[in-house]
A protein has these predicted regions:
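Alpha-helical transmembrane segments and their membrane-interface exit regions
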Residues: 45-50, 107-115, 156-162
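Cytosolic, membrane-interface loops and tails of multi-pass inner-membrane proteins
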Residues: 1-2, 50-69, 128
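Multi-pass membrane catalytic core of lipid/isoprenoid biosynthesis enzymes
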Residues: 11-16, 57-114
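Membrane-interface loop-to-helix entry segments
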Residues: 10-16, 75, 127-137
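Helix-coil boundary and interhelical linker segments in multi-pass alpha-helical membrane proteins
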Residues: 24-40, 75, 79, 83-105, ...
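C-terminal membrane-associated helical module and adjoining short loops/tails
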Residues: 124-162
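Topogenic membrane-insertion module of multi-pass membrane proteins
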Residues: 1-52
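C-terminal ends of transmembrane helices
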Residues: 54-62, 112-125, 162
Length: 162
């Protein structure tokens, strides 16, 4: 294996580390360590913000054409931007208790469809609809400590926009 090929695989490993970050974040949320969970959510964003640059610099599509880095990216992004924040919303008691399960199902379902849209972005790279950044929503709902019914309406409204 050449050094360039090894570097290309390391970039994919870097992206895949997002899955580990997502899993550890879920564990922290279950333990009610919300501040630590937000730090890891931020780490996931940092990985997501930089892995594409690294992939282009390492020419991963050219060197490893049989590996679909875009699919890996989507899997990791869905975990970090949808599953983890929904788990957070559930365990941080930000939603009405009697409605929390069906409410967190809305972003899970709408974002699953959103992630599969081939035309998710405009020609100038803006998202069509709400771009499934549920981690940001979870952060603001937690920081603002808005009433659970307001949070429920927010989740419902944004799920429709996806």
């Amino acid at each position: 294996m050449t050094g360039k090929l090894a570097l290309a695989w390391l970039v994919h490993l870097y992206t895949a580390l997002g899955a580990v970050v997502a899993f550890v974040t879920i564990v922290l949320i279950k333990e009610l360590k919300f501040q630590e969970a937000f730090w890891l959510m931020s780490l996931a964003v940092a990985i997501d913000a930089t892995d594409g640059t690294f992939a282009r610099a390492a020419r991963v599509k050219e060197l490893i054409p049989q590996f679909d880095g875009d699919r890996l990216e989507d899997i990791i992004d869905y975990a970090n931007y949808v599953i983890v924040p929904c788990w957070f919303l559930l365990h941080a008691n930000l939603l009405p208790a009697e409605d929390s399960l069906w409410l967190v199902s809305l972003p899970l379902l709408s974002s699953a469809y959103g992630f599969c849209q081939k035309q998710a972005k405009t020609g100038d790279n803006f998202f069509l609809g709400f771009p499934s950044y549920w981690n940001i929503i979870a952060f603001y709902l937690f920081v603002l400590q808005s009433p659970p019914w307001v949070n429920a309406f927010t989740i419902l409204f944004l799920s429709i926009l996806v």
